[in-house]
Amino acid sequence: MLQERIADVSKFVEPDRVRREVYTDGQIFELEMQRIHETVWIYCGHESQIPKAGDYYTLQIGRQPMLMVRGKDRKVHVLYNRCPHRGNMMCGDRHGNTGEQFRCSYHAWQFHHDGTLKNIPMMESGYAGTRVNKGSPELNMKPAARVESYRGFVFASLAPTGPTLKEFLGKSIVAFDDMCDRAPGGEVEVVPNCFRVIQHSNWKLFMENQI
C-alpha cells in the first residue's frame, strides 16, 4: 500500500544521494500532487492574458484542469474546468472568449463567468423525478479555494487554509516588484504568442536544472 510504503518519505533522501523512486515512482508522484501542487499557491497566468469579459485561459493545478476567466465585473475568477453535471470539460482550447456565459457542450448547461449556474435547458421536463435542484450550490462550477493577484500575476490555491500569497512568496516578491517597476507605468503584460515549453519529465528534474 502507498501509505505503508512511503509513510516516512525522508527515507528516500539521504545526505549524499536521493533514491531513484523519487523521480520514477508513480505513487510518489501522486502523493506530491496531493500534498504539494494541490495545496500551495500556483501561478495561473497574468491578468493581461484575459483583458475582456469572457476571456479565459486554461491551465493545470496538480492533476486538476482549471481555467482563469475575466468576469463582467472585471474580477478574475479561477474555476475547475469541468461541468458539475457530468464532469465534461468546459473549455478545450488553451485560451479564448466564452461570450456571455460558459456553455457545456454535453447537456448545454450555462454558467455565469464566476461559475454560478445560469440556466438548465428543459429543467421543468427533462429533470423531473431527479435530485437536480437548480438552487443548489453543488450545481455551480467549483471555484479554486483561494485566488489572489499580485501586480497582475494571478495565483490560486486549492486549499482553503494556509499562508497568504505574500507570505508564500516571501523574499521572492522583490523580483516581481523589480520587474514591474522597470516597465512603463509600473505594469507588465504577456504579449500574444508567448514562448511556452512542455517538459516531458518528472517536475523535480526540471526544477533542479533551473537552480
Segments predicted by a language model, with ranges:
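Rieske [2Fe-2S] iron-sulfur-binding subdomain
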Residues: 1-75, 112-211
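Glycine-rich active-site/cofactor-binding loop and its immediate structural neighborhood
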Residues: 55-105
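Active-site HxH/HxHxD metal-binding segment of metal-dependent hydrolases
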Residues: 99, 109, 121
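Extended, hydrophobic alpha-helical segments in both membrane/secreted and soluble proteins
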Residues: 104-106, 111-113
